[in-house]
Regions:
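Soluble ligand-binding/transfer domains with enclosed cavities or grooves
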Residues: 288-491
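Flavin (FAD/FMN)-binding glycine-rich loop and adjacent Rossmann-like elements that form
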Residues: 2-67, 115, 236-285
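Short hydrophobic core segments
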Residues: 102-114
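C-terminal, flexible cofactor-proximal segment of oxidoreductases
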Residues: 152-294
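Glycine-rich loop(s) and the adjacent beta-strand/alpha-helix scaffold that form part
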Residues: 1-2, 120-160, 191
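A conserved short coil-to-beta-strand element within the FAD-binding core of flavoproteins
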Residues: 76-93
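Rossmann-like dinucleotide-binding core of oxidoreductases
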Residues: 1-46, 53-58, 62, 77-79, ...
């Protein structure tokens, strides 16, 4: 997401501020960008998540979650459109419409972070000079030059005191304050810093936005513009991007030009660290654009919920009847367990790996449906697996469950090895039009079960960032087995 949002080749230069007051035309354009990234208007998850035509002229609001939309689709989160009008016992009334929500166990008041209590230590006269207004939660004070200071309180500075701060901007704010306080002579001369301060209208802009009904979600300014404007004031030049090996992107014919704080080193001593960080950015971008890296994570995230499953079994031996299975496959998210993982040296189970947020996840997969043979005989069938994703190795794996407890993993079935589209029958990246199988990301695996070998082939077709349909096929050969299975999963 950051690669798309902060690709400097996506915008004309010099950059202008895209935040603040949002005209209807700008709102429609940004809504279009969001819809393109998501692959639709979100109605596939719920009618309550759909962005209606009349809402496209309103300023967009963005929230990022791996699981929310599919929790809604699966019914684990139930939505109601409106605002809570009253709460009586365990029943809430929603306005407009008067709909009732029953059996409420707890209420989370999601009013947002209120920064005003953080300013309680300041004297009242200072708060007045800062135009402090507790009722304006997003803009509680009005500061000069991108939220750094107020000229009437010259010995007070702010770093990161704005809605949704980014490290790069906070670093620039700290650099600015160091220059502003250590070289006061520049503040009234003809230097770049002096010119920027003379042209600055940040205080009045903040006051104007406080009651603006078209104020953006992040009113102070967008990240690339703030970095550019503060760097110009400090006389910092952006370093050239490292693009060796990066392909030109199809929408503009240019390589990825990713903005990172490392592109604004402020001394020769920082040059080596800057080079290492920029090379790291290039390496990640190269892997993401030219290899299957991160596809396993995208697949894992998008499996959540219930899928329709149609599967054909074709057997060459009478011991395994040919037939068709029709049913569902449910991926139930839970914290990752240690069952089946490699044991520690002292014999105790190894702790499950954790992702960057301190949690690791897995799915309990439950398949249920009816199998009908060619002869017309039918019976109910079910099976279970545990699906896991290893963040450190970027590997998706499937595990058998214990016979005595089918909620727990037993031992490894296979690890999924992804290829590039076009390999093993894949024909495309499974983007906006990628619905047909064989047009997505191919993957393969293998498993030897005593004398029987399972050759596994996957195909994952995405629509933008969401998995739209996928298939898995098994070719099983052994002394007493010779059959193929092909199953297709759709929402």
């Amino acid at each position: 997401m950051d690669f798309a949002s902060y690709n400097l080749n996506n915008r004309p230069h010099p950059l202008v501020n895209m935040q603040g007051h949002i005209p209807e035309e700008t709102a429609q354009r940004v809504h279009g960008v969001f819809q393109g990234v998501l692959g639709g208007d979100q109605s596939a998850f719920s009618r309550h998540l759909r962005i209606a035509d009349e809402d496209r002229v309103k300023q967009p609001y963005m929230a990022v979650s791996d699981w929310y939309c599919d929790f809604v689709r699966s019914g684990l989160i139930t939505l109601s459109t409106g605002k809570v009008d009253s709460l009586n016992g365990n029943t809430a009334t929603v306005a407009p419409g008067g709909d009732k929500i029953d059996d409420i166990a707890a209420v989370v008041v999601a009013t947002g972070f209120d920064a005003s209590p953080c300013l309680d230590f300041l004297p009242q006269d200072v708060l007045q000079k800062l135009n402090h207004s507790p009722r304006h939660i997003d803009l509680p004070i009005a500061l000069a030059f991108h939220g750094t200071h107020h000229p009437e309180v010259p010995d007070l500075g702010f770093v990161g005191f704005y809605r949704s701060p980014y490290w790069g901007v906070m670093q620039m704010q700290a650099r600015f304050l160091a220059r502003y306080w250590s070289e006061p002579g520049e503040n009234g001369g003809s230097s770049k810093l002096s010119v920027k301060l003379a042209e600055d209208v940040s205080i009045q802009r903040t006051l104007d936005l406080r009651d603006d009904p078209r104020c953006s979600q992040f009113p102070m300014g967008d990240y690339p513009f703030l970095m550019q404007d503060m760097a110009e004031a400090l006389g910092l030049s952006i370093t050239e991007p490292l693009t060796e090996g990066l392909p030109n992107l199809p929408h503009n014919g240019k390589p990825l030009n990713m903005l990172t704080p490392a592109r604004y080193p402020d001394s020769s001593e920082a040059g080596d660290d800057s080079q290492k960080l920029r090379e790291g950015t290039r390496s990640v971008a190269l892997a993401g654009l030219t290899s299957p890296r991160f596809v396993a994570r995208a697949v894992f995230r998008s499996l959540l919920g219930t899928w329709k499953l149609e599967r054909d079994l074709v057997s060459k031996l009478p011991s395994h009847p040919t037939g068709h299975f029709s049913g569902t496959g449910r991926f139930l998210l839970r914290r990752q367990t240690s069952d089946g993982l490699r044991c520690a040296t002292d014999g105790t189970p190894a702790a499950p790996p954790h992702d960057e947020e301190g949690e690791a996840w897995e799915y309990l997969y439950i398949e249920e449906g009816e199998f009908k043979t060619e002869g017309g005989f039918g019976f109910r069938a079910t099976r279970r697996y545990v699906w896991r994703y290893d963040e450190r190795r970027d590997v998706l794996s499937v595990w058998f469950v214990k016979p005595e407890d089918d909620r727990r993993a037993d031992y490894l079935f296979h690890e999924v090895e992804f290829g590039m589209p076009g390999e093993s029958g894949g024909g495309g990246r499974g983007g906006g039009g990628g619905g047909k199988l064989g047009k997505g990301w191919p993957a393969k695996a293998g498993h030897l079960c005593i004398d029987d070998f399972y050759n596994v082939q996957y195909d994952f077709a995405f629509q933008a960032v969401n998995l739209r349909e996928w298939s898995v096929g098994y070719t099983v050969k052994g002394p007493k087995k010779d059959y193929t299975i092909r199953g297709t999963y759709t929402r």
